[in-house]
Amino acid sequence: HLANLKAIDPMKIFHKTIDYKIYNGNHQIPVRIFLPGEKMEDDLPVFLFFHGGGWVTESIDNYERICARLASATDHIVVSVEYRLAPEYPFPIGFYDCYMAAKAMYTNQFILNTDPDKITLIGDSAGGNLAAAVSLMARDQGEFLPKRQILIYPAVNNDYSEESPYLSVRRYGTEYLLTCLLYTSDAADDT
């Protein structure tokens, strides 16, 4: 179904959205729920979506059309997470927002009563990194265990050296949008 996203006319997509908040301590994490039809059904599978943007740009608003298409094309509910961005919120703040959103979904502390076996973590670029990292932390913490991920061109290799196997990194490895150094824990320690 994911391969058919471009075939769907975005102007003909019917979708209903619901804005909701998940709590992470004193912070409210905004999420937007995209329904593939007119009403919310608890038995539908869910994509928990983390947007890309190098951990410093993008939002659930900018990903509205993508998430609506995803819901419509796959008959899944899509829950898009508005995690906090660097540099205003250095690592690991945005990551913990994503983790807490996933924990709320998997432990039924959310508006949807979704079967945990029907939840898939999904993200592109930095969002793919977050989906993978949330899965690893969930495994390590033992609080819940995601069974599926869809990682779309995930940012998973942090080698920005001149010896990198990737030409783009060797040429542009110090450019701001490629490295987003303010999101790394090393940069956060320097502030």
Task: Mark where each language-model region is.
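A glycine/proline-hinged amphipathic helix-loop "lid/cap" segment
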Residues: 1-36
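Short substrate-entry loop that stabilizes the transition state in hydrolases
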Residues: 40, 53-74, 79
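Short beta-strand element of the alpha/beta-hydrolase
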Residues: 43-51
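Alpha/beta-hydrolase active-site loop signature
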Residues: 54, 83-87, 156
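Catalytic nucleophile-loop/oxyanion-hole region of alpha/beta-hydrolase
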Residues: 59-60, 66, 79-118
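Primarily recognizes the serine-hydrolase "nucleophile elbow" in alpha/beta-hydrolase
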Residues: 103-111, 117-164
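A catalytic-pocket lid/entrance helix-loop region that shapes and gates access to the active site
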Residues: 161-181
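Single conserved hydrophobic/aromatic residue that forms the stacking wall/gate
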Residues: 183, 187-191
